[in-house]
Amino acid sequence: MTGRAPSLIALALLAALVAPRVLHAQDMMSSVNLSSPTFTEAEMTREEVAALLDADQRPDLSLRRLNGLDLSGLDFSKVNLRGAYMNKATLTGATFDGAILDQVWALDSNWSGASLKGASLFAAQFRGANLSGADLTNARIAGDLMRANLSGAKLAGADLSADMKNQSMGLMRAVLDSANLTGADLSGANMMRTRMKFAKLAGANLSEANLMLAELAGADLTGATVTGANFNEADVTSAKLVRLVGAHQARDLDKAKNLDRAIRN
């Protein structure tokens, strides 16, 4: 069917999020044509999407091309959007609670203030997306969020850990390299093996978060709250661990990798 994603695209996305083969997401980008209609054109209008949502409580929007649409304020709760194309779409203030966003392409999209509580973002491509102030409480995230803006976002109880059960293509985990998580609420989040190289975590709430084996090289945690956070074997090479709140109550901070090479006050 015209406009539907070829299997090679899905495979390329999965390959971009695994270890150890792919640590550079640009490798995945080079394997697909991002200027093709699949990635740039929409097959529906906002009005058609809204009508479908009104007519069916849980419509199937999987693999739909919604690129560039303004879908702000719409309610996609529990809707199946698996494999949909939402590049450069505007979703500000929209609701995606419990929605399936697995394998979604949402490059440079705007989700500011959107609610994605309990949503599934497995193998999703959110690179460069704006998720500032979004609510991802208890969401499952294992995708590419490199350079994404998550400042002030709510990720309390979210699961960003590596998928240790399905490793046929390698280690699937959230990739947040150079992402902006300034002031984000990550309390109680599971970030075991999550990759956050050079991420901005200044002022973030990491209390009771699981950071075991996380990659935090070059990350800025200035002023972050780390009470009860588990740093066992997290790589903190060149990370800024300055003015941490609750550092004495953090777990296994002394067991973090390359702690002697971190920037500390």
Language model segments and positions:
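Short, flexible coil/linker elements and helix-boundary hinge sites characteristic
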Residues: 1, 19, 56-57
